[in-house]
Amino acid sequence: MIAPATLAEFAAAVRSAPRVLAVGAGTKPRLSAVEAVKISTRDLRGIVEYEPSEFTFTALAGTPLAEIGAALAEHGQYLPFDPLLVAAGGTLGGAVATGLAGPGRFRFGGVRDFILGVRFVDGLGRLLRLGGKVVKNAAGFDVPKFLVGSLGRFGAIGEVTFKVFPRPEATLTLELPFDPATLTRFARSRYEPDALDVPPGGQTLLVRLAGPGRAIEACAAEIGGRIVDGAVWDRIRETPWRFATAITPAEMPHYAAAHVSGAGSVAWSMEPPPCGLTLRGPEPLWLGDRPRHAIEDAVKLALDPHGRFPGLDD
């Protein structure tokens, strides 16, 4: 594994091998399980520029999300989409490459809604700068958004610029029964939730409220439910989905589970129980077939004409 310390070394590392893939802290290893020379961003870390008054920051790809969150918190700001795997050591570049967002996506959108600019190395080994460093920049194609969720197939991300939001004055989490009467009452409320989540079991609904303290207290009184510790959202962001246990085939239906996340606009389900179970798998796992788009193929051809970076079909 190559570990460059500067963006110039990063570009040279990409040019050094016919097939490469940039990796961060390794918190999502199944998404980078391809045959290629790995280029680590662990030494490409640090906040390059931060303008609290402009609500933007620029940081190197290997910067831990926890470090970024701490710096933003000092100025009462944050990334509203709730990046995943922060405590596990997830990096800014990894958040962009995977495009994964947490509970805050329900209200604020995902990673692609906050990225402004990027510096990355294309398949020809060129260090390119695309996008801008200001929120109002709207010139040209919004290519940085193509890199969100690309898993490194268009280029190796070296530096990213994001916009941020002011941190709300207060937050409050409610646990409600997941039944028609409660949902009807909640839907009629005049307040907009910050995040929603249905934990495994489907018996309860978690609602996060954010804003001025008195306002969310009034909202909670109107909606009802039980106030719970807001740390539950941190556990959701760390995606504690994996478990290991010895069971017999007859016991499988008992362990069938579904997690419906309004926050991430996605539902993970295993149904019927015996048919959705994968015990072993050496390759990255995908749900369904990957749709092909002419625009995506054209971008790949323009940025990586020789296929230096692995594609999703590899």
Task: Go through each PLM region and give its residues.
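Short beta-edge/loop segments at beta->alpha junctions of small alpha/beta modules
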Residues: 24-30
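N-terminal glycine-rich flavin-associated loop
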Residues: 1-22, 41-88, 100-133, 169-176
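Conserved glycine-rich FAD pyrophosphate-binding loop
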Residues: 32-34, 42, 202, 225-314
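Conserved active-site and cofactor/substrate-binding residues in soluble primary-metabolism enzymes
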Residues: 5-9, 63, 67, 87, ...
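Short amphipathic alpha-helix segments
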Residues: 176-196, 217-222, 244-260, 271-274
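Terminal amphipathic helices with adjacent charged low-complexity linkers/tails
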Residues: 208-226
